[in-house]
């Protein structure tokens, strides 16, 4: 019975979640091409971006309120501050004394939309499920060149000093429309 209830709660959460939960942007910081994936869970945001020339994925964290998105990394003092409107994310990138304008446009041409990702998975992807002792959330950590990597975070508290948590990654192939790892 608990499994059936959990299944329906996941479907309700998945179907009636407020607002957009995932963006895949492409564009430029200054004159450098970049790709960014933004995952929104209520007002909390985690994101990754990479300079297309180098490919190294840089994690970012932040908040989204009334269309204003603020992201920063934990190490280098890098910050993005901008507005999301009409499928665009535009604003200012800062690192130390250096400031550049950025303009990113939502584009899924060589990536998977969240809807496609949901349909590829054997089990529905729930963006977030929470109760008193359990949290599960899914975000997209890479989405480029026909591959998408979904990061599934789970936390369970069952007593004691602290809870247990884990992260699982699933890689999907757009061309063959299947889970590959």
Residue ranges and their predicted role:
Residues 12-21:
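Bacterial Sec-dependent signal peptides at the C-terminal "C-region" and cleavage site
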Residues 20-181:
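Compositionally biased intrinsically disordered regions enriched in Thr/Gly
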């Amino acid at each position: 019975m608990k499994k059936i209830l959990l299944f329906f709660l996941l479907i309700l959460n998945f179907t009636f979640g407020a607002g957009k939960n995932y963006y895949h942007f492409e564009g430029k910081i200054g004159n450098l091409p970049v790709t960014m994936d933004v995952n929104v869970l209520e007002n909390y945001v985690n994101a990754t971006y990479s300079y297309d020339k180098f490919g190294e994925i840089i994690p970012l964290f932040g908040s989204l309120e009334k269309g204003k998105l603020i992201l920063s990394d934990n190490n280098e003092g890098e910050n993005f501050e901008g507005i999301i409107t009409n499928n665009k994310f535009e604003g200012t990138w800062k690192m130390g004394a250096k400031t550049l304008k950025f303009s990113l446009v939502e584009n899924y041409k060589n990536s998977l939309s969240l809807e496609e990702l949901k349909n590829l998975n054997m089990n529905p992807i729930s963006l977030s499920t929470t109760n008193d002792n359990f949290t599960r959330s899914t975000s997209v950590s890479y989405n480029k060149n026909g591959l998408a990597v979904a990061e599934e975070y789970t936390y369970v508290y069952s007593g004691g000093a602290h809870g247990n948590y884990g992260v699982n990654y699933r890689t999907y192939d757009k061309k063959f429309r299947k889970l590959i790892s």
